[in-house]
């Protein structure tokens, strides 16, 4: 049997998110155009580079200078190219491009006497101004005459690691490692040539890819290192007609570093039985390839994403349901009605939340600190308290309420203290036994007595969510300087942690890998939501131990539990993420048989765990493609399931349910329906995505590969997004650029559209 969550807590969270005062420069909500506009003209020509470096070479000395030794040599190369500026006059209707290509090689001799070398082809491209006039679309070719030779300075270091083996008196074999660097420097002069160039039309853009190299260390293990590579191209755009002259200013220098440094270790046992470990720092050459002809997106002078002139990639329009156009390409996003409704609903939501927490004038039978799931006592009867619902409600109050009512929080702590120590159908409470199994009981009466009727037990997410909420209360008490007094069985934040939180953490340590019912109380197994909130609770708790406690056995158990849960979640063998699906699977044991695995609870988990940047080191962050693609697939499936979504457009928020196969209607089994909780979860995900990028000033990174990891971006945000094959390519929208700001605006409007759907439904039903 299923019952609804206390939905107001999440609505409250969303209202605060949607009303965030983002800087208008970053979220231009009133813009009337869906096009990306370019920045102002630049006066400096650009240089662009294509690098390709050889891999390292392993050689065996032919001499017997170092008996039994092997030498591993790798070439690291730093190339600096200087382009001497010239005065160039060209027609404004065409930019012209000049390309000079040379191959640079470096040679050196290592200490073993071997000669090694590495070569790099170097391509230098310069571009002259282009026109911004929309009517000037003609193409032509331009011949650029040779001017001044281009000199390339190459500094090459040959890194050699040698080792030799000897036998000490007594039979012990030892190995000695020596690392030597041999620098070489030389000049290469490139004679200028005449070059015929072809017209393109684009403005500043940054393209970033991640390049990885892999090698095998002396222990036979495969190691790898990755390096991000950014190429920025700049083409000045004129604002007039006729001829445009770019005056020589200063040399344009492009410096490229092309090595990935990794540290390798190998362990072995010598003849004396002693285990030894050696460490080697290795420079691994990598190959960077940038092809401007395969659909990487530039930002054009015309203000839209161009795909080499063959097609245009534009932000999708957002058109709302029920015949109400909230935004289209010819008008502005009208958010005033939504903002007014949010302010009213915010006030109502806060009032309703506190009415459901004892002591309540509306429901006098609720004991102080008890959070009821619903005031409904018949059809259905949810006049109970759930550990999960209570924790999520309190968490929302502490996180988002301007006045969290400290006495209410202390009363909630008091309820938690006593419920932990109350016997129930799962076992004895804390104090009667050291076994924590009874903490998995999810449902309690409003008078704090145990609910003893049959139910889905245990539910292992409750203690974790309670820990997360209480840790936030501890922070609030410390920040506000609240005096706890002697009214409750805890007189300090240390008491709260030791007497309540520590027991919930012990439950997680003991039972995280045990089966339990999911948050919908329907399936007994291992669940993504449960595991991720357990991981978060353990991770957050570790910062609350003082220096003397951090080496204690309990803290080490917590660290080990954190490692174990993290590994379990991301291991493809466990099914939460695998190659078959393009989304997170909530309960793998029933995927492919009873359900698709799609479930709104995965977004609820990500929203709860990653509510602050400090949790970004944990898996499945808000910007994780798996999280965003889960939202995309939920929208894709539920758009056609529920009749209320019939008039919704493809790139617009819809009413969402729990999972596509749901048959619970809120009271009985028949036909599933959308839920306020689920619909708001979608908005929360997008709001947190926006907040993360703006608050931390992060660039937007859009996957460009074709393994479906960019489904959210290609099908909800952009049109005609070209992929780059199987390589890990990315489109980078730099922070606070026009492209970044307008993309953020579209995501913001998509987030708002879920709430607009909710608003329209509530108004139609009189709520």
Curated annotation (Swiss-Prot):
Residues 49-66 have a biased composition (Polar residues). Residues 348-691 are annotated as: H subunit. Substrate binds at residue 455. It catalyses: Hydrolysis of terminal (1->4)-linked alpha-D-glucose residues successively from non-reducing ends of the chains with release of beta-D-glucose. Glycans are attached at residues 35, 308, 322, 414, 423, 434, 513, 546, 645, 650, 720, 741. Its EC number is 3.2.1.3. This is Glucoamylase S1. It comes from Saccharomyces cerevisiae (Baker's yeast). The lineage of its organism: Eukaryota, Fungi, Dikarya, Ascomycota, Saccharomycotina. The gene is STA1.
